[in-house]
Amino acid sequence: MAVPQNRVTRSRRNMRRSHDALVAANPAECPNCGELKRPHHVCGACGHYDSREVVAVTAETDLDEDAA
């Protein structure tokens, strides 16, 4: 089993962890429908990318209403 040869100081430990921080999402507004979407990705609400429809979006069905 691996055992540390020398103690890792607080400074060296923290410098190693300096790149581990999470980066917040940077959503952009879809120019077609106005929903928030990830930059350089197809809009999940309307299926448009770069002012063109690339994915045909079907109407969502509510499963709770069908069961009742």
UniProtKB/Swiss-Prot annotation:
Q: Does the keyword Ribosomal protein apply?
A: yes
- GO molecular function per UniProt: structural constituent of ribosome
Task: Output the Gene Ontology cellular-component terms.
Answer: large ribosomal subunit
Q: Name one GO biological process term.
A: translation
Keywords, sorted A to Z: Ribonucleoprotein, Ribosomal protein
Q: Does the keyword Phosphoprotein apply?
A: no
Family, according to the entry, reads as follows:
Belongs to the bacterial ribosomal protein bL32 family.
Its name, as the record gives it, is Large ribosomal subunit protein bL32
Question: What's the gene?
Answer: rpmF
